[in-house]
Amino acid sequence: MSLDINQIALHQLIKRDEQTLELVLRDSLLEPTSTVTEMMAELHRVYSAKNKAYGMFNEESELAQSLRLQRQGEEDFLAFSRAATGRLRDELAKYPFADGGIVLFCQYRYLAVEYLLVTVLNNLSSMRVNEQLDISSTHYLDINHADIVARIDLTEWETNPESTRYLTFLKGRVGRKVSDFFMDFLGASEGLNAKAQNKGLLQALDDFTAEAQLDKSERQNVRQQVYSYCSEQLQAGEEIELESLSKELAGVSEVSFQEFTADKGYELEESFPADRSTLRQLTKFAGSGGGLTVNFDAMLLGERIFWDPATDTLTIKGTPPNLRDQLQRRTSGGK
């Protein structure tokens, strides 16, 4: 992994009581040692693998103004990170759920792209066994479960300031308010809606195959082809490219998929990030509610699984052996 740290700073927020968040600021930057670089490589890997929301700075963003000055050499990175951590503390203090944590700012380069990553990491306790097989306590940064993270593509921001996608962030696992306070701190608003783009792609694909008058098997083959392409892009950390996807679908219709989406007004970007959960709908049907969870391969619809829209009834012919065994035990009075 070609990740080069330019500058990295750590600070800390300590929750003393319900109303107090204490600020602990470092007086110097971290040295980019092999351990620090390994930690950042892991953080980059974990963050890159997650579904992210996309955004852009508001005109009045204090963070953007300070970052611009820092990039122009008018403010050093340590001073920038210290001031930003103070603003983060002030923003967090407005919320009753506010917790402390390790605040990390890192400017780094990965594959010719410069990034600024900002995150609040939990510092957790655990146990370790040493070479003498003695047990002692230790602390570690919970990188795998980080949910307060934002990353600015500095290269994109500086070369294409009108972009709506140079800033990415996680919405958090504990509710909308987590991303609210972080967006307020960043002075940012949501931009490109990747999930909406993926849903638009699926709708366009359904309409495209319908207009091409493909039969059921052909339609499913096209969906599988698109799913394979999108999955490969996702695994490679690349975006869905409408032009390259259109080439994948050459021969399906006299009109290319790219021309079809443009003519029909689907408003798809030339490229956009893949959304894993949305793309699963290409090959799977899934849903849950009212104590019922259903998940099956799309190819089974009309073969072993039938839906009657008039009565909203799903009929399954041939149940999985483990499910059938449970049903037989329960209906026969067994346990």
Swiss-Prot record:
Q: Name one GO cellular component term.
A: bacterial nucleoid
Q: Does the keyword section mention Cytoplasm?
A: yes
Q: Does the keyword Cytoplasm apply?
A: yes
Q: What UniProt keywords are attached to this protein's entry?
A: Cytoplasm
Report the subcellular localization. Answer: Cytoplasm, Nucleoid
- The family this protein is said to belong to: Belongs to the YejK family.
Q: What is this protein called?
A: Nucleoid-associated protein Ent638_2782
**From which organism does this entry originate?**
Enterobacter sp. (strain 638)
